[in-house]
From Swiss-Prot:
[4Fe-4S] cluster binds at C104, C108, C111. This is Probable RNA methyltransferase sce3898. Residues 373-382 have a biased composition (Low complexity). Disulfide bonds join C97-C353. GO terms for cellular component: cytoplasm. Its EC number is 2.1.1.-.
Amino acid sequence: MLPEELAGACGIDLTDARRIVSLAHRLGELPARAPATVRRAALDAARSAGEIRTLALVERRASAEDPFVKYAFRLEDGATVESVRIPLERPGRYSACVSSQVGCALACAFCATGRMGLTRNLEAWEIVEQVRLIRRDLDATVGGGARVHGVLFQGMGEPLANADRVIQAIRVLSEPSAQAIDMRNITVCTAGLPSGIRRLAAEVPAVRLGLSLGSVRPGKRRLLMPIDGAHPLEEVLAAVGEHARASGHAPMWAYTLLADQNDTDEDAACLAALARGFAAQHGISPRLSLIPYNAIGAPGDPLPSPDGGDERGASADPFVRSARLDAFRAVLSAAGVGSIVRYSGGGDVGAACGQLARPSAEAQRPGGRRAPPRPGATAGAADVGPSAPPRPA
C-alpha cells in the first residue's frame, strides 16, 4: 500500500504513513513499540488495519558458475514461485527478476513456465515481497552497500495478463518510502498483449518495456508463441511504438535463438528489416537482445519442428552454435542493426532465462489448469491497510 492510501484508510498523518510504510518494508513487520519518529496512535491505527503478510523462502540456490541466485518462495495457498537475483555490471548492484503469476497460460515453446499452465495471478504484495526478501538476503550475504538497483518482470508468468496488480506493484516498488527503485530501472517483459502495453504507457510511462519475439515470421512465431494467433506481431508492434513515444525509451526486443528454427540468415534479414521499419515509423530504434536457448524440460525433450509437424527431428537439439550466432549477428550488422547477446547466467541451478518453473499446489489437484501437452498448441511488504496486508502493495 502506498503512504497516501494508508493515511486515507487509517485516518493518520501522511508523514506518519510514510514512516510506517518505510518501517514495514525495512523490517518486514511493524514494531511492538513506536520509534521516536512515529506517533504511537498512528502505529496502532496501522496495526489494527491489517496484518503483515509475507512469503516463505523454501529454497535458495546459488550458481557455482556466476553470481546468480535463484529463490523459491511458497505462497499462503501452498503454491510456489521462483525469482532470481541478477548481478549488474557495476559492482554491488543487482536486479531482481520477479514472477507475476503462478504458471502461465501462453505456452511459449522455449519457456518452462509455459509448460505449467496457469494457476493464478499474484497479488501486488506478493510481487513486491519477492523484491523485499531478495534485498534482505542481499544484505545478509553480500552486505557492503550492495543493493537491488532494478526489477525485471521476466520471471514466471505474463506480467500484462496481470496488469492491475503489476502496475500497483510497480508503484509500490518505486515509492521512496517503500523500495525506492527508480521506475526507469524497472522493465516489464511481455509476449505481446497490446492492451497491457498501452496501460503501461498511460499509467507508468517511465517503466521500460521488453518484448519477446520468438520469430518475426508469422508462421514460425505462431508455432513458437501461440499468443501470436490472438495478437499478431503487427498489432503488438503498434502498441510498442505508442509506448516508445510516450516513454521516450527504446523498447528491448528479446529474440530467443533456436537451432534450425529461427536462426537462419533469412530469419536475421527479416528481423533487421522489421527493426529498421520500426525505427523509421516511430523514430526510436529497438534494442535487440539475442538469447541463446536455455534447456528446459527433460534432457532431449524436443521443441516444435520448423514446419509445425509432430515429427520434430532436428529440433531435438535446439542449441545454437557460436558460429551460427556470429553469422546471425553479422547479417544484422550488415543491415545497420546492432545487437547484443544476453548472458543468461545461473543455468546450473535452473535460473537462466526461460528456465523458471515450479509445480503448483493447484496444478497438482484435479481441476488445476495445465499447459497443453506440447508447445505450439493453441493458447489463448505486503500492504498496510484494511483490504490488503501491511507491507508493499
